[in-house]
Each structure stands twice: as structure tokens, then as C-alpha cells.
Swiss-Prot record:
PANTHER family: SULFIDE:QUINONE OXIDOREDUCTASE, SULFIDE:QUINONE OXIDOREDUCTASE, MITOCHONDRIAL
Cofactor section: FAD
GO molecular function, one term: FAD binding
The protein's name: Sulfide:quinone oxidoreductase, mitochondrial
Subcellular location field: Mitochondrion
Domain of life: Eukaryota
EC number(s) given by UniProt: 1.8.5.8
Entry keyword Disulfide bond: yes
Modified residues (Phosphoserine): 343
UniProt keywords, alphabetically: Acetylation, Disease variant, Disulfide bond, FAD, Flavoprotein, Mitochondrion, Oxidoreductase, Phosphoprotein, Quinone, Transit peptide
Length: 450
């Protein structure tokens, strides 16, 4: 058992104190990074590929380790988005503008921003190439390139998004279309899909279904809506405890769930969706819709698929406990682009960042990593405009809950955490390299027991 004094007086004291002050103390904005230009140098101690959640977080951590002038981030995008909030944007509960900030404002101060796209990785020569023909070498490489959205793998998309009845919470270009389709709904089928590929935030495709059902009830349209969730999977959720809770909600709210159904075509002009039956190859079904929410197929970024750092499926091939590459000891991976066998979420990235920080630290000292990632990930399953089931679990698909109560129950407190606390932690702590997940809070709330 860990005494309370040991928790609050150790190296996590600053973070713990900050959590206690949430809601009573304002935190200033991130320091603006003004060096948004191509690198003047062509070699860095630590080179980070990708300016998403994993890339920015690790750059902040590496800055403290080797100095800002020795760290660079390769990222072409002008804006950085907190994507988990898009579930609420698509349901009209948050504004899209609240989810994004200029990339320059989240790059750690002093870290070089190489505003370019990676076109080739050459780990045998410790260098990468960019789309402006620059060659950049490194001593340590962190790959945080995220996951690629493949709307075009569905016939009729992305051009079908020009029609007003279709939306998708997975893209900044289409998330507001979900809210428009929801508002314009009159009568008929509201269809929500889950593709036959790995996805980021695997709970999001059904979260918008629950929110839509709540919206229909709120606006008096529920009796006119036939709500359908067509998923390529064989279960509603991968962890039994939470799957059982979700099944109860599905039954109570009269939602239709069809398993092993994969969206292959959208006929937007006819308002029809075509699904293949994964259990019976060649068998298809056409369903008309009044509203369609599409979760696109996803894959590793193209630059990784043929790279030496990728496994056979195209994901960065890392050790699942240390996040160190299996073949190149000075290469590391974090987040959605890796083959880590856990759910691809921002919460997973936070937990991974603490482990990877420790891994790189000991490798820099020519030591063997001992700190191990347990696969922790979290999915706040939004089941209404004021209710969330907070799913937390590990590699074994066993619950790994932070709070000392049953998190499979719908709770207002967990919704407020999803809507307000988590964005605060993301912008003000995680991206600054000070949030490595709730493991220490779990020990505190459970009186030191794992």
C-alpha cells in the first residue's frame, strides 16, 4: 500500500496539485512557436515524425531531455486538432472551432518545426526525406504519423459528402455535416457504420448513434427514426464488462445492431447504402437512409506501408512493452501508426508517452528498458448528452479502471470529464509532456493497490 504522502510528495506532486486546482485556476495559453519554417540544419539528436498528439507530446518530453535546439518535428499541417471532441461536435454539443489551434501554438518553444511531409524513411542510414527534397538525419527517431482515413475505398465517397444526408465525425471536413444531417432528419432509417479495418477510437462509431437517439427523443422525432448500427465486428465492444452494459442500453432504446456488415458503397443521389455480408462473401444488402454516419476504412499512412520500419500490415513494428522498434534500436513508435495490440486512442498515447520517455532515457544511457507498457487505453463511451460509460482496459481486454466505483454505469460526472476535463488535460498538460495517463491516480484512488 502506498501512503498518501508518498503520492503527493514525489515527482508527480506538481501534476497532482494541478488536478486538485482544476476549475479554480486559469492556465495561460501555450507559448507561441514562431519558427514555422524548414530546418536550417539537416541533423537532429531527436527527430519526431508527425505533429499530432503523440508527436507533440514526445517533442515536449524530448526537449527537456536533450534541449529544444536538438529536437525537430516534421509536420505539414497548419492546424492541430483535439479529435476526441468531434463526437460532441457531430451531435451539436460542442463547436468545431473549440477543437483546433494553430500548429505553431502547440509546437514546444524552441523545437524546430519542419513544415513538410515525410516521403521516405531510411533507418539503415538514419535519415528521412521530405516532399521538398530535403534529407534530414537523426540519432533517435520517433514515428508518430497517425492513421490514414480511406474514404475512397467506399464506392461513392468522398464525393457523396456533397449530399446533405451524410456525415462523418472522423474528418474536420465532414464532422459538421453529421450535425446538419441530424438536424434535418425527418423520418426513416438513421444508419451508423463500422468498417472492416483497424480504426482510431473504436467507440466513436457507436457514440454518435446514442447521441443521435437522444437528439431524436429530445426533438420528438424518435418514433419516426429507425436506428441501425451496421458493424463489421462480431461484438458491440471488445471488453465484456462494457459490452454487457452497452447491450442493455441497446435493448432499452430499441436500437438495431447488425454484425458482420461492412459498408462498401454509398449511392448518395438515391440515399442508399450498400453493405456486404462478411459471413457470406458475395452477398450484399441495399438499405435506404434518411441519415448516414460513415466511419471510413483506415490504414497506416502510405509512407509507412512500404517502409523498412513497417510490419507486414504496414504498421510501425515496435515492442509492445517498450515501444522500441524491433529491428532498429534507435527508432521508436507511438500511437495510431504502431502495431501495438490495443485500442488506438488519445488516452493510449498519453500512457505510451510516459513509457516511451523512460525507454528512450535508458537507451540514451546504453541501458536496457525495464518500464513496460501494459496496453492501457480508455474510451469514454458517450451514451447521451449527459451520460458516459468510462471504459478503461489493458492488453488483455481486462478492465483497468481509475475510479473507485463501477465505471460500466452511465454517469454525468464521466460526461463532464469527457467534455471539459479531458480537453483541459490535453491542451495544458499532455501536449506539454506532463500527462502520462492516470496510473498514479488509480493507485491513489485504490489506496495503493494495483
Amino acid at each position: 500500500m502506498v501512503p498518501l504522502v508518498a503520492v503527493v510528495s514525489g515527482p508527480r506532486a506538481q501534476l497532482f496539485a494541478c488536478l486538485l486546482r482544476l476549475g479554480t485556476q486559469q492556465v495561460g495559453p501555450l507559448q507561441l512557436h514562431t519558427g514555422a519554417s524548414h530546418a536550417a540544419r539537416n541533423h537532429y539528436e531527436v527527430l519526431v515524425l508527425g505533429g499530432g498528439s503523440g508527436g507533440i507530446t514526445m517533442a515536449a518530453r524530448m526537449k527537456r531531455k536533450v534541449g529544444a535546439e536538438n529536437v525537430a518535428i516534421v509536420e505539414p499541417s497548419e492546424r492541430h486538432f483535439y479529435q476526441p471532441i468531434w463526437t460532441l461536435v457531430g451531435a451539436g454539443a460542442k463547436q468545431l472551432s473549440s477543437s483546433g489551434r494553430p500548429t505553431a501554438s502547440v509546437i514546444p518553444s524552441g523545437v524546430e518545426w519542419i513544415k513538410a511531409r515525410v516521403t521516405e524513411l531510411n533507418p539503415d542510414k538514419n535519415c528521412i526525406h521530405t516532399d521538398d527534397d530535403e534529407k534530414i538525419s537523426y540519432r533517435y527517431l520517433i514515428i508518430a504519423l497517425g492513421i490514414q482515413l480511406d474514404y475512397e475505398k467506399i464506392k461513392g465517397l468522398p464525393e457523396g459528402f456533397a449530399h446533405p444526408k451524410i456525415g462523418s465525425n472522423y474528418s474536420v471536413k465532414t464532422v459538421e455535416k453529421t450535425w446538419k444531417a441530424l438536424q434535418d432528419f425527418k423520418e426513416g432509417n438513421a444508419i451508423f457504420t463500422f468498417p472492416n479495418t483497424p480504426v482510431k477510437c473504436a467507440g466513436a462509431p457507436q457514440k454518435i448513434m446514442y447521441l443521435s437517439e437522444a437528439y431524436f427523443r429530445k426533438t420528438g422525432k424518435r418514433s419516426k427514426a429507425n436506428i441501425i448500427f451496421n458493424t463489421s465486428l462480431g461484438a458491440i465492444f471488445g471488453v465484456k464488462k462494457y459490452a454487457d452494459a452497452l447491450q442493455e442500453i441497446i435493448q432499452e432504446r430499441n436500437l438495431t445492431v447488425n454484425y458482420k456488415k461492412n459498408l462498401i458503397e454509398v449511392r448518395a443521389d438515391k440515399q442508399e447504402a450498400v453493405f456486404e455480408n462478411l459471413d457470406k462473401p458475395g452477398e450484399t444488402q441495399v438499405i435506404s437512409y434518411e441519415m448516414l454516419h460513415v466511419t471510413p476504412p483506415m490504414s497506416p499512412p502510405d509512407v509507412l506501408k512500404t517502409s523498412p520500419v513497417a510490419d507486414a500490415a504496414g504498421w510501425v513494428d515496435v515492442d509492445k512493452e517498450t515501444l522500441q522498434h524491433r529491428r532498429y534500436p534507435n527508432v521508436f513508435g507511438i500511437g495510431d501508426c504502431t502495431n501495438l495490440p490495443t485500442s488506438k486512442t488519445a488516452a493510449a498515447v498519453a500512457a505510451q508517452s510516459g513509457i516511451l520517455d523512460r525507454t528512450i532515457s535508458v537507451i540514451m544511457k546504453n541501458q536496457t528498458p525495464t518500464k513496460k507498457y501494459d496496453g492501457y487505453t480508455s474510451c469514454p463511451l458517450v451514451t447521451g448528452y449527459n451520460r458516459v460509460i468510462l471504459a478503461e482496459f489493458d492488453y488483455k481486454a481486462e478492465p483497468l479502471e481509475t475510479f473507485p466505483f463501477d465505471q460500466s454505469k452511465e454517469r454525468l460526472s464521466m460526461y463532464l470529464m469527457k467534455a471539459d476535463l479531458m480537453p483541459f488535460l490535453y491542451w495544458n498538460m499532455m501536449l506539454r509532456g506532463y500527462w502520462g495517463g492516470p496510473a498514479f491516480l488509480r493507485k491513489l484512488f485504490h489506496l495503493g493497490m494495483s
